[in-house]
Amino acid sequence: MSDSTSSPVAAAPSTAMTRPVSEALLNEKWDRCLSNLLIKSTLGLGFGVVFSVLIFKRRAWPAFVGVGFGAGRAYEECNTSLKQAAREIRAQA
């Protein structure tokens, strides 16, 4: 007698919908922008604190200026990246 205990299991169709390319690209760009903002602002704060301690007699303004420079640089890079992504999407259409 041939007892077949292993019955073929039909693969269920994937219910997870894939995102459109433009949405996935936008999410990737935003993730990069936010991480870039965090990293550059932190580096600016670090340089500001170091300059504050070494040169400016422990004043607070160099730290704030460093955060501003870091955030501004991250904003410009994000703006450029998003505009470039928009151009690429328009070129594909």
From Swiss-Prot:
Protein name: MICOS complex subunit mic10
Residue stretches spanning the membrane: 34-56
Purpose: Component of the MICOS complex, a large protein complex of the mitochondrial inner membrane that plays crucial roles in the maintenance of crista junctions, inner membrane architecture, and formation of contact sites to the outer membrane.
Cellular localisation: Mitochondrion inner membrane
Membrane topology: Single-pass membrane protein
Keywords linked to the UniProt accession: Membrane, Mitochondrion, Mitochondrion inner membrane, Transmembrane, Transmembrane helix
Topology, Mitochondrial intermembrane side: 57-93
BP GO terms, sorted: cristae formation
Key word rRNA-binding present: no
Disulfide bridges in this chain: none
Xref: InterPro entries: Mic10
Keyword Heme among record annotations: no
Organism: Neurospora crassa (strain ATCC 24698 / 74-OR23-1A / CBS 708.71 / DSM 1257 / FGSC 987)
Main location group: mitochondrion
Stated family: Belongs to the MICOS complex subunit Mic10 family.
Quaternary structure, from the entry: Component of the mitochondrial contact site and cristae organizing system (MICOS) complex.
Chain's gene name: mic10
Entry GO terms, CC: MICOS complex; mitochondrial crista junction; mitochondrion
